[in-house]
Design a protein with these regions (language model features):
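Flexible glycine-/small-residue-rich
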Residues: 104, 159-161, 172, 213-215, ...
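Short amphipathic alpha-helical segments
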Residues: 166, 243, 384-390, 587-589
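Catalytic cores of soluble metabolic enzymes centered on carboxylation/carboxyl-transfer
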Residues: 259, 298-300, 304-522, 527, ...
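Catalytic P-loop NTP-binding/switch module of NTPases
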Residues: 552-593
């Protein structure tokens, strides 16, 4: 067994690997860039080595720096995590020449499966189902159009290298092919340094189902069931679960056998994942093989009880798999929500900054939170914006869903925008709950984008009740009155997104009573003002809200909703009807860069009239192209930058007349 393992990665996956190493009694080494000197993975490891400046191209992706760190610390093996060098065949070869063990597959399977064209050829030879398409490199957009027409629309334009949803675009008509091709080329070149593109048929309304495998050096290969990965934005997974509600045991076995057959054909060892797309008739087709540990591996661990990192380490150390296929049992259900620093209401624009508050729901049973951040830490512009992976477990899907909803409602982040409300909305979505999903779920269910302030009537009332309760407690505390009745006997008005609720509050037997439409609402809570999370029992039911005091009332979030609730006395409400509310959005004619990034294209000209939703420009940030659209109609007055310019956060892009 290895004595010391260097983790050639950062963030939550580095922390995850360190945990298993500690359990096995193996010493650990973290590497870090200048931007990560205070990161969690640095403090968790036994040793830590600086490997250079913040950009990954000068630190985490530099093979020689990783090898020097191994030699300096005496590490005899490297775990690559995922991303960075995890699927780099040259890295594996160089480690081998230096006598350092790579905890993963040999270089040749990595090379073959890393090329989406060559991998499909091997898959077909192995008897694995593949998608119809043009399995060759396409030289330009003109050729792409001709090939797409031959295949038949819709088509998927894809980068031959890489993964993670980068370098992929769907073209539903001939008019969309050129833009899809050019965007895929640019994103692939930026992300992988490889701009080779191919085209295949796009399967309508598919599910994204993947099979986890383990293979050792003695010819033993097993599968550990499937993961449902259909909930995606920008072709990148955000919610995964195991098992899938769509897959029966017969289909699971068939997909598992094809995955095992492919692994055997390419002499694969270690943990790996064979990804498939599955159509509505349960026909499945090979998508790609990820020759590394997947981001979403925890859901498999939770339903099988197998530590995949431990198995990877043991296989790399030359041990034979003790597990046989018949040993793998699937118990219960697990769901993973990826919590990202991004703004779902602005086309998932990445967010950066300091985590002023970071409260994890660690008091909830059957929850696992894999993270690489801490309160006070920063989300950098240089790396993936993932904050954590929140996983729930239950005896069945309903229990796992309920636990996940509870955990998301009790997970609080302040300082950066995040997708918790969006994830909660999906978990509560009726189609999602029923299992009626596909990879286009988000586009179908949120055609006009996600808006957390569009609240249904049930929660408008609940939010108004909660805000009224907080307001009354706050008033009592701030006035420091001994006679509670002087404070509580009031008529209050709550306004939730233009909807009005009128309440009467008073004290009865030293308890706060709230009446609505003549009915008494009972509230039981130990909430302390100032706490950002409030647990209230309203009419016998438990609810959790995230609470922030604002000038006019409270900002409340929970259950996929977020809103500023204004609280008035009856007189103040009547007076407010005569006040004109200033619309700041109408007065802001400047479009600014939301975060540091590179201008890929300016898509308007001075004097051009645009409408709400029109594309203004494309900014590359965190290796993803982000389209900035107009929020209102107007005329372009001035443009302050050009294609190829690097912009700072809040730097002016253009101005409206």
């Amino acid at each position: 067994m290895f004595k010391k393992i260097l983790i050639a990665n950062r963030g939550e996956i580095a922390c995850r690997v360190i945990k298993t190493c500690k359990e096995l009694g193996i010493a650990t080494v973290s590497v870090y860039s200048d931007a990560d000197s205070r990161s969690l993975h640095v403090t968790m490891a036994d040793q830590a080595i600086n490997i250079g400046p913040a950009p990954s191209s000068t630190s985490y992706l530099v093979i020689d720096k990783i090898i020097r760190a191994c030699k300096k610390t005496g590490a005899d093996a490297v775990h690559p995590g995922y991303g960075f060098l995890s699927e780099n065949a040259a890295f594996v070869n160089k480690l081998e020449r230096e006598g350092i063990k790579f905890i993963g597959p040999p270089s040749e399977p990595i090379r073959v499966m890393g090329d989406k064209i060559e991998s499909k050829i091997f898959a077909e030879k192995s008897g694995v189902n593949i998608i119809p398409g043009h399995q060759a490199i396409i030289k330009d957009s003109k050729e792409a159009i001709e090939i797409a027409k031959k295949i038949g629309f819709p088509v998927m334009v894809k980068a031959s290298a890489g993964g993670g949803g980068k370098g992929m675009r769907i073209a539903k008509a001939e008019s969309e092919v050129e833009d899809a091709f050019n965007s895929s080329v640019n994103e692939a070149k930026s992300s992988f340094g490889d701009d080779r593109i191919f085209i295949e048929k796009f399967i309508e309304k598919p599910r994204h189902i993947e099979i986890q495998i383990l293979a050792d050096n003695y010819g033993n290969v097993i599968h550990l069931g499937e993961r449902e990965c259909s909930i995606q934005r920008r072709n990148q997974k955000i919610i995964e679960e195991s098992p899938s509600s769509f897959i029966d045991s017969s289909l699971r076995n068939e997909m598992g056998e094809q995955a095992k057959r492919l692994a055997s054909t390419i002499n694969y060892t270690s943990a790996g994942t064979v990804e498939f797309i599955v159509d509505q008739n349960k026909n499945f087709y090979f998508l790609e093989m990820n020759t590394r540990l997947q981001v979403e591996h925890p859901v498999t661990e939770l339903v099988t009880g197998v530590d995949l990192v431990e198995e990877m380490i043991k296989i790399a150390a030359g041990e034979e798999l003790k597990l046989k296929q018949e040993d793998i049992k699937f118990n219960g259900w697990s769901i993973e929500s990826r919590i990202y620093a991004e703004d779902p209401e602005r086309n998932f624009m990445p967010s950066t900054g300091r985590l002023r508050r970071y409260i994890v729901p660690d008091n909830i049973n059957s929850i696992r939170n894999d993270t690489g951040v801490y309160e006070g830490g920063e989300i950098s512009i240089y790396y993936d914006p993932m904050i954590s992976k929140l996983c729930s477990y239950g005896k069945d899907r309903n229990e796992a869903l309920n636990t996940m909803e509870m955990a998301l409602n009790n997970h609080y982040i302040d300082g950066i925008r995040n997708n918790i409300d969006f994830l909660t909305a999906i978990i509560r979505n009726k189609k999602f709950i029923s299992g009626d999903i596909n990879t286009g779920f988000i586009d179908e269910e949120y055609q006009d984008g996600f808006k957390a302030n569009i609240i249904d009537k049930q929660f408008s009332l609940l939010f108004s009740i909660a805000a009224t309760y907080f307001f009354t407690l706050d008033q009592f505390r701030s006035r420091n009155q001994n006679d509670r009745s002087l404070i509580f006997e009031k008529s209050l008005v709550a306004e939730v997104e233009k909807e009005i609720f009128k309440f009467k509050t008073y004290d009865k037997n030293d308890n706060l009573i709230i009446e609505f439409n003549g009915e008494v609402i009972t509230i039981d809570s130990n909430y302390e003002l100032g706490n950002p999370i409030a647990s209230l029992m309203i009419n016998g039911k438990d609810y959790s809200f995230k609470v922030e005091r604002i000038i006019s009332g409270y900002k409340l979030s929970g259950y996929g909703f977020s809103s500023n609730i204004k609280i008035y006395s009856s007189r103040a409400f009547e007076l407010s009807k005569h006040m004109i509310e200033k619309n700041y959005a109408l007065n802001d004619k400047i479009i600014r860069c939301p975060m540091p990034g590179l201008v890929i294209s300016i898509d308007v000209v001075v004097g051009q009239e645009v409408s709400a939703g029109d594309k203004l420009c494309t900014i590359e940030a965190m290796k993803m192209e982000n389209v900035i659209r107009s929020e209102s109609s107007g005329t372009i007055k001035k443009i302050f930058c050009n294609d190829g310019d690097s912009l700072a956060s809040d730097q002016t892009i253009l101005e409206f007349s």
